[in-house]
UniProtKB/Swiss-Prot annotation:
Belongs to the WD repeat LIS1/nudF family. Positively regulates the activity of the minus-end directed microtubule motor protein dynein. May enhance dynein-mediated microtubule sliding by targeting dynein to the microtubule plus end. Required for nuclear migration during vegetative growth as well as development. Required for retrograde early endosome (EE) transport from the hyphal tip. Required for localization of dynein to the mitotic spindle poles. Recruits additional proteins to the dynein complex at SPBs. Changing I69A: Impairs self-association. This is Nuclear distribution protein nudF.
Amino acid sequence: MSQILTAPQAEALHKAMLAYLSVINAPQTAETLREELHFDESYNEATCKKFEGVLEKKWTGIARLQRRINDLEAEVRSLQAELEASPSAARAKNQDPTNWLPKPSSTHTLTSHRDAVTCVAFHPVFTSLASGSEDCTIKIWDWELGEIERTLKGHIRGVSGLDYGGQKGNTLLASCSSDLTIKLWDPSKDYANIRTLSGHDHSVSSVRFLTSNDNHLISASRDGTLRIWDVSTGFCVKVIKSATESWIRDVSPSFDGKWLVSGGRDQAITVWEVSSAEPKAALLGHENFIECCVFAPPASYEHLATLAGLKKPPPATSSCEFVATGARDKTIKLWEARGRLIKTLHGHDNWVRGLVFHPGGKYLFSVSDDKTIRCWDLSQEGRLVKTISGAHEHFVSCIRWAPSPNTDNPDPAGEKAGKKDAVKPSYRCVIATGCADNSVRVFS
């Protein structure tokens, strides 16, 4: 005690302790302590009265100070996050793309659709952006110039999903619709409709190319099935049935195309192995329809492993480790792909409609019917660090990140994600969102 308190401070503390014991009616304990401390007759009733309440005041004072310290530390963290997200901070970091967050105002607002925009997709090489709408059309834009290039007509009901993919040097655009079909469009032939894939028994909700086979794509439908198609022949090569046979709203492949994650009306997320077409895990926890699901890229493994309490992150070569999902229950959930819930992110005030990971791995972006884009920092336990309020004037239905050009690796981090001495990946800091206000917005 002598090393912490001065002699007068120690004496005052002892007197306060004796006074406290007297107040709580513990005379025997007080007398024992008085003898141990060798207090003489100078410690009388008047001294006791003088020190009554001192111990309690110091205790409550410390509690108030601790609360104030906690509040100040939280404020410092918030200000630090804002500082790091500010344009000036970005300049100070030499425009480090790993810390890029979209500005509140969009670079371009693209208007031409006559009904709600439901989906968007970026060309993997060129500055082309495709958007699909309830007006049954697909529009191709130059996102860099903010100009429309062409309108594709062919679907007879609303377009619900889009994706670019296929063989290198022969990129195709796939679209799906409530008209039960999937259509393939060839950009090298002025986006001619080269093939229509039929087989689903209800609306087709989502379509994505598989990188494990350049000729294969996966579709999800309200008929309760996932179907794998050979785009070169137009034939369905595999049908995957959900256990509940309920509406599958979304499907997303892993970066190597070996795994799928799907979710929908039954409120369950399923992880599938493509080669066996068998479910490998069921992720249960949402309380309403699943609207979107996506695998985390290896660049985010470090942060998600910390959230999951793992001693070290999984290898960057592993493609099926973590999953993010959004639902009509207004929440985003982060999962281990084996089925364990890691974190639930609260903040949206309406249905969560779309998710995309920042290729740098640090952030997760989400869009919602609450008209916002929200940015969640995975390095801060999924903390909400930025909200773009009024990103659109109506429900925000979809979000996509522009892929990196001139790369053969679909994962932006690649196998170098775990190497500290590896060269930092380069990628486009561009996102596009679609909305029920009939517009597409580009943030770059």
